[in-house]
Amino acid sequence: GVCGACHRMGTTTFALQLVKYLQLKGYKACYVEVNATGFVEQHERTFNTVHDTYLGKVTFENVEMYYKQEKLLDVLKQEYDYFVYDFGTYMDTDFSKTSFLEKDVRIFVVGSKASEMSYTNELIRNEYYTDVNYVFNFISEKEKPELLEYMEEKAAQTYFTVSTPDQFEYVPNEAFEKLLPVEDISEPEEEPRGFFRKKKGKKKRGK
C-alpha cells in the first residue's frame, strides 16, 4: 500500500511506477484506487482507454486500474500477482489506518518542503507506524545525506524517488529493488529479425 503525507506528493505516480516495475519483472500487477481523488475516472474521461464499467476497471498504457471500492472483493478474485493500493493521503478523513497496515508492504511518500515537513514529521514520530517505508519525493542530491541523518534509526527504511515526467512510462529506480526485491521472471525479448537474409560468403579456395 502507498500513502502520501499530504496532497500533491506524487503518491499516485509512485504507485503507478510500482505497477510498471512489477510488470517489467514479469508479474501481473494492477493499480487499486482506495481514495476519493477520482484519478482513474478522470483518466477514462480524458484519454483513449478501455473501460469495464461493471468492475470499475480502466486500462491505459497497459496498466489496469480499478476505482470501484465496492467491487474490491471481485477485483481480488482476478488473476493478479500483485495489487498496488493507492490510499491517497494520510490527512484524508477517509484514510483507513487498519487497511493500510494490513498490506504486505507499506510505503509513505513524504517530502522536505516547508509546506510538507510538518506532515512528514508527524508520520515519522507516530509510534503507530513502525514497520513502514518512507520515500522522499522531489529531493535534490544535496538534500539526501541530510535527510538520512534526520531520519535517524529509520534511515534504513528511507528511499528517494527519481524524476518521472510521465506517470505511465517506467523510470528505473534502485529503490524499487529494495522495497520489492522480487525475482525477475520476465522472458527475454527476442532479437528482431531483418527483412533480408544474410548472404552466405563464398568459400575461398586455397592456393
Q: Where do the PLM segments sit?
A:
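P-loop/Walker-type NTP enzyme "switch/lid" segment
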Residues: 1-9, 24, 28-94, 98-102, ...
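Hydrophobic positions on the alpha1 helix immediately C-terminal to the Walker A/P-loop
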Residues: 14
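Active-site signature of alpha/beta-hydrolase-fold catalytic machinery across serine-
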Residues: 17, 21
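Glycine-rich loops and low-complexity Gly/Arg-rich segments
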Residues: 25-27, 54-58, 108-110, 131-135, ...
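Generic hydrophobic, helix-prone segments enriched in Leu/Val/Ile
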Residues: 43, 65, 147, 175-180
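Generic hydrophobic alpha-helical segments
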Residues: 69-73, 120-123, 171-179
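Conserved catalytic-core segment of NTP-binding enzymes
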Residues: 78-82, 87-172
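NTP-binding/hydrolysis catalytic cores, primarily Walker-type P-loop NTPases
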Residues: 168-207
